[in-house]
Design a protein with these regions (language model features):
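A short, N-terminal "cap"/entry segment at the start of jelly-roll beta-barrel domains
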Residues: 1-35, 114
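Conserved short histidine dyad/triad with adjacent acidic residue
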Residues: 24-27, 38-54
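Histidine-centered metal-chelating micro-motifs
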Residues: 48-50, 68, 84, 88-94
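Ligand-binding loop in jelly-roll beta-barrel domains
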Residues: 88-113
Length: 114
């Protein structure tokens, strides 16, 4: 078992994201898992990502606040304890349209070597 203390998590940059901070909990440079990447992201009001698509599958779990996820022109407002699955190469945009910080857990498969 590996325990990762919040105080030991390291920040990372995610492409096409804005108004956010993210901490890598497991996988990639944080180690611990070779089969998935888990991060914790905080989106400020007005912060978000995309629209874009990437090969890895993703799951978002909303810890607190609310986040609007836009896929195929349809908007879904996710609140605390809601989650969603984003498929491989599925174009999505996420936006925090609230006045509070939105905190989410992101789990995804690591990119595979081509």
């Amino acid at each position: 078992m590996i325990v990762r203390r919040f105080s030991d998590a390291k920040p990372y940059e995610a492409p096409s994201h804005r108004g956010y901070t993210s901490l890598r909990l497991f996988g990639a440079e944080a180690g611990g898992s070779k089969e998935m990447i888990v991060g914790l992201s905080h989106f400020l009001p007005g912060g978000g990502a995309g629209p874009d698509a990437s090969p890895p599958e993703k799951v978002y779990f909303i810890v607190s606040g609310e986040l609007t996820v836009i896929v195929d022109g349809k908007e879904h407002v996710l609140k605390a304890n809601d989650s969603c699955y984003i498929g491989p190469n599925e174009t999505r945009e996420i936006i925090n349209r609230s006045n509070d910080v939105c905190t989410i857990v992101v789990a995804m498969l690591p990119p595979r070597a081509q």
